[in-house]
Amino acid sequence: MPSSLWKHCLNHLEGELDPQEFNTYIRPLQAIQQGTSLQLYAPNQFVIDWVQNCAESRINALLSHYSSGRIEKALLEVGSCSLQPQPHIQAVELTSKSARSSSRVVDRIPESRLNKNYTFDSFVEGKSNQLPRAASHQVAENPGSAYNPLFIYGGVGLGKTHLMHAVGNYIRSRNPSARVVYLHSEQFVAEMIKALQLNAINEFKTRYRSVDILLIDDIQFFAGKERSQEEFFYTFNTLLEVQHQIILTCDRFPKEVNGLEERLTSRFGWGLTVAVEPPELETRVAILMNKASIENIILSDDVAFFLGRLIYSNIRELEGALRRVIAYSRFTHRPITMELTREALKDLLTLQEKLVTIENIQKTVAEYYKIRVSDLSSKRRSRVVARPRQTAMSLSKELTDHSLTEIGKFFGGRDHTTVLHACRKINELKSIDRRMAEDYHNLLKKLST
């Protein structure tokens, strides 16, 4: 009964929930009956937290309905009801057999191209990347079965590639014989074109359909390239049929990439799609402190927070600014102080001061949500105004040095508790509402260009 009961619940929930939420938090749950309860095993704590906050009461109601009252509630726990050996071991053994049967094919497997510096240990975790990090680690522990494919999307320089390499390095550290291949989508296209020119397309197909783990970066570059999409489509299907892990990254949600065929974007949704958001201030500071320690540099809190507020939407640019400060310190033989930091980044500071003001934030938010700037300072409380107002307050706190009280004055004289509530509300929504997270990310990009 448990499997059919849970299947009924799944079918019902799939019709009620947003597809992204269902695939991310509900589909991965595994069910087994325990007395008058149904034990639901989740891959990680983040899934449990979401289910408890957003779906637990509905699940309990459905369980009671479909079991005629025999099952009273669901119990949530991190784990798996499977007693089978770790899937990653099985997958590697499977491909090892095929490898022994044809050493010529193995010789054609491309090199891994993994960056050894990109590991889970070197990845700085924060609220903005908790779910992608947890999902990636789950895939590394159970490749081919946890989430397949794993699709990670987000802006440039937010850690997508780092997570992808971290999975590959983790798997290789546990099983050196695993055939893990990383490449950029443009490289896939270039190699396919060369194979066509050399009349060696069959060899090309064999190379990428014989790997254990395929990691492809920036799949938006497949857009408009019909032959490349066709080849990748069949490679994708072949690997999934034998439960070999695929991880893909993109700069936006897959269905928003113009020129990608529907048959591809629909398959990307078979596994798990997660977004990497721009890191919050505390995470940016932690990243800076981590990079400074690697360089044996002691970075003061005031300098770290100054840099974290200065650059907020791109980790690569953040690290680049730190490298400039360190280099300037070494060239001038002076310690890293606020004064030196301002000297080293004076051109960037001049540009930022022109761009990021509360007035500019209000104008950008108003244009984005198609409301008047004056609405943000008005007493109107309708949702069409309240949510943009809260968003603008949150952006003002993140991107400027103004206090909560000062920010409130720009929004109709609201007090600091109202601003604080707005910031907390937006942070909460970003973690559970994909549309809110995308809106916030888009606004950050607009304000940083």
UniProtKB/Swiss-Prot annotation:
Domain topic, free-text comment: Domain I is involved in oligomerization and binding regulators, domain II is flexibile and of varying length in different bacteria, domain III forms the AAA+ region, while domain IV binds dsDNA.
Region feature (Domain III, AAA+ region): 113-329
Function in brief: Plays an essential role in the initiation and regulation of chromosomal replication. ATP-DnaA binds to the origin of replication (oriC) to initiate formation of the DNA replication initiation complex once per cell cycle. Binds the DnaA box (a 9 base pair repeat at the origin) and separates the double-stranded (ds)DNA. Forms a right-handed helical filament on oriC DNA; dsDNA binds to the exterior of the filament while single-stranded (ss)DNA is stabiized in the filament's interior.
Gene Ontology CC terms: cytoplasm; plasma membrane
Quaternary structure (record): Oligomerizes as a right-handed, spiral filament on DNA at oriC.
Keyword DNA-binding: yes
GO biological processes: DNA replication initiation; regulation of DNA replication
Region (Domain II) location: 71-112
GO molecular function: ATP binding; ATP hydrolysis activity; DNA replication origin binding; lipid binding
Highest taxon listed in the record's lineage: Bacteria
Listed name of the protein: Chromosomal replication initiator protein DnaA
Region listing for Domain I, interacts with DnaA modulators, in residue ranges: 1-71
Domain IV, binds dsDNA, as annotated region: 330-449
Annotated compartments: Cytoplasm
Lineage of the organism: Bacteria, Pseudomonadati, Pseudomonadota, Gammaproteobacteria, Chromatiales
Pfam families found in the cross-reference section: Bac_DnaA, Bac_DnaA_C, DnaA_N
Residues involved in ATP binding: 157, 159-161
Record-linked PROSITE patterns: DNAA
NCBIfam families: DnaA
